Amino acid sequence: MPRKGHIQKRDVLADPIYNNKTVTKLINNIMLDGKKGTAQKIVYGAFEKVAEKSGKDATEVFEEAMNNVMPVLEVKARRIGGATYQVPIEVRPDRRQALGLRWLTMFSRKRGEKTMVDRLAGEILDAAANTGSAVKRKEDMHKMADANKAFAHYRW
């Protein structure tokens, strides 16, 4: 625990095109080696493809995808009397969003399409339709939490 109190969390600026902080966080997640311009091109290109394929506003589809990807419960290892239990706990809202964005980017990188724009667009569309690898990861996490519900009283 820090002696000087808690560090203030810095707030990200909303992105210039969609005026949305979550989109900025997605850009920061996609970014590799500090190349923000490249990351912006990827995200904005993917959003154009999403709007084109779905016929809806790209930010609406993205928000829907995020809601389908963000986990509500996760398990945390807790050691009690020599045994380690997987204890289900609720996920804080900021961590929920961070995990959702991380999974979206991770699974879009693993997809088979040719360009990252296509991969990200595909993963966003799949997540909005409640399919895709990122949604599967969330469901697996919820299944783990459900299976270990008996240890919920070990929460701290």
UniProtKB/Swiss-Prot annotation:
Single GO term (MF): tRNA binding
GO biological process: translation
Record's GO cellular component terms: small ribosomal subunit
Signal peptide: none
UniProt keyword terms in alphabetical order: Ribonucleoprotein, Ribosomal protein, RNA-binding, rRNA-binding, tRNA-binding
UniProt xrefs under InterPro entries: Ribosomal_uS7, Ribosomal_uS7_bac/org-type, Ribosomal_uS7_CS, Ribosomal_uS7_dom, Ribosomal_uS7_dom_sf
Pfam families according to UniProt: Ribosomal_S7 (PF00177)
Family statement: Belongs to the universal ribosomal protein uS7 family.
Subunit structure: Part of the 30S ribosomal subunit. Contacts proteins S9 and S11.
Function field: One of the primary rRNA binding proteins, it binds directly to 16S rRNA where it nucleates assembly of the head domain of the 30S subunit. Is located at the subunit interface close to the decoding center, probably blocks exit of the E-site tRNA.
Name of this chain's protein: Small ribosomal subunit protein uS7
Species this chain originates from: Lachnoclostridium phytofermentans (strain ATCC 700394 / DSM 18823 / ISDg)
Gene label: rpsG
